[in-house]
Amino acid sequence: MNAPKFRPLKFGVTRVTLRDGVPGTHYLTAEQPLQPFAERMTDRLQHWAKTKPEHSFMARRVKQADGTSGDWQHITYAQAWQTARNIAQGLIDRGLNAERPVVILSENSLEHALMGLGCMLAGVPFVPTSPPYSLVSVDYDKLKHVLKTVTPGMVF
């Protein structure tokens, strides 16, 4: 059996200084200077959508009717970028903002990820919420608390 191949991983910060603040508070400061980075998480998606548009960004196994795993469904960088832009515009058109965020009440999926990316592009906060809060709960107290706390403009 062949062992999987791994490439070396460079960690950015390897040394920190610790400073105590008020009781129970600690501050960590990196000793190495911060290297150049993308300002927004979506900047990297945009970069790869232009650089490697047809390369796979995310994938999932399609579940067959009998419960077995079928073929892989791939989303390319270009598809993800365009879909995220479309979602972002839809959120803006609907007036969503920091006071009216999106609650994502769905399982981990490609659609969940794309909705999150669209929210990031639009500058709209999103709150991933555990599906059992609505599917398994009898009293829905946890779901009610989430919805009362964030006052969503949309539930996905």
Protein language model regions, located:
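A short N-terminal helical cap/helix-turn-helix that marks the beginning
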Residues: N2-R19, P36-K63, Q82-A84
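Short, contiguous pre-domain boundary segments
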Residues: D20-E31
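Conserved AMP-binding/adenylate-forming core of the ANL superfamily
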Residues: P33, E54-M115, Y133-K144
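Short polybasic/polar patches that bind polyanions
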Residues: K50, I92, M120, K148
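Phosphate/oxyanion-binding loops and surfaces in catalytic or ligand/nucleic-acid-binding neighborhoods
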Residues: T51, A122, G153
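Short acidic/polar active-site loop segments enriched in Thr and Asp
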Residues: N97-R100, P125, G153
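Short hydrophobic alpha-helices that are characteristic scaffold elements of the AMP-binding
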Residues: L117-P128, T149
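Conserved ATP-dependent adenylate/AMP-binding module captured primarily in the ANL superfamily
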Residues: P128, P132-F156
